[in-house]
Regions:
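Active-site-proximal cap/lid insertion segments
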Residues: 1-4, 32-34, 85-86, 96-256
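Active-site segment of extracytoplasmic enzymes that catalyze sulfate/phosphate-ester chemistry
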Residues: 1-61, 65, 71, 95-96, ...
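Active-site neighborhood of phospho(di)ester-bond hydrolases with catalytic His/Asp-centered motifs
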Residues: 7, 74-77, 151
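Residue-level signal for the start and early helices of compact helical domains
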Residues: 11-12, 16, 22, 46, ...
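Active-site-proximal alpha/beta segments of enzymes that process anionic O-linked groups
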Residues: 14-23, 51-85, 112-146
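Active-site micro-motifs of SAM-dependent methyltransferase domains
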Residues: 27, 81, 155-157
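Short, structured coil segments at secondary-structure junctions
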Residues: 91-92
Length: 256
């Protein structure tokens, strides 16, 4: 799949979500990193910008605008724009599933989910459950205007694919062959004494750099071929979800 005309306001989630909700650039609302933000490292040349810990209350969201104009509004899935008082219900949403869970990611993708009391049934997969909740919401609100913000927890840590899809990609991986180093090293741009390309290439084969750990002081590892079958399975499960929920919405009589 090639995305030839796509845009994201930021490379991490919280600022992009804030932009989707408000139409504002992340810097204009002082929300430029995932919440709660990252610490400063001793080797950094520049300090990280201060980050608001929630979506500012004075910002008007698309959910608020639509709710005030007669739409039913709901978010299903991940919020990650603040905790406590700065929850979806405070920013224009009538419903939030799972209610009260405002963390950045789940503890696991298989039930019990432990999402503030939202547990699921044994063996259920979180992406599929969110899909079911979305189609249920659409059906329940098909006779009037509604806004549904479908915000999957996937694809995010912990990387846990649906079992049938994991097996699918396990079989596919067994048929694939790749020659060359599994990863290369790139220097950290904040390194005060950057490693040369030759030094980086020579370090790839030392024991200290085995596996896929990130050493932020000096180097970052870049995988050269994708072999994570759990990740692939998570992506396909989310694609399946969109393939289910979008047609349900498109076939409503009033075209919501």
């Amino acid at each position: 799949v090639r995305f030839t005309n796509a845009y994201a306001a930021c490379h991490v989630s919280s600022p992009t979500r804030a932009s989707l909700m408000t139409g504002r650039y992340p810097a204009s609302i002082r929300l430029t990193d995932w919440l709660p933000g990252r610490k400063n490292w001793p080797f950094q040349r520049l300090l990280n910008a201060p980050v608001e810990q929630h979506l500012p209350f004075e910002e008007i969201t698309v959910a608020e605008t639509l709710r005030d104009n007669g739409y039913a509004t709901a978010i299903i899935g991940k919020w990650h724009l603040g905790k406590g008082d700065s929850n979806p219900l405070a920013h224009g949403f009538d419903e939030h599933i799972p209610l009260g869970y405002n963390e950045g990611w789940p503890q696991g993708y298989y039930a019990p989910f432990r999402l503030n009391g939202y547990e699921g049934e044994e063996g259920e997969y979180l992406t599929d459950v969110m899909t079911r909740e979305a189609t249920k919401y659409i059906e329940e609100h098909k006779d009037g205007p509604f806004f549904l913000y479908m915000s999957h927890f996937a694809v995010h840590d912990p990387i846990q694919g649906r079992k049938d899809l994991v097996e699918k990609y396990r079989r596919k991986l067994a048929t694939m062959h790749y020659e060359g180093d599994p990863y290369i090293l790139e220097g950290n741009p904040d390194d005060p004494d950057p490693l040369t390309r030759g030094e980086l290439d020579s370090l790839v084969h030392t024991k200290a750099y085995q596996g896929y750990r990130v050493l932020p002081q000096r180097t970052v590892k870049i995988k050269q071929h994708q072999d994570n079958i759990e990740f692939a399975a998570m992506v396909e499960a989310m694609d399946e979800s969109l393939g289910i929920t979008v047609p349900v919405a498109l076939h409503l009589d009033h075209g919501s």
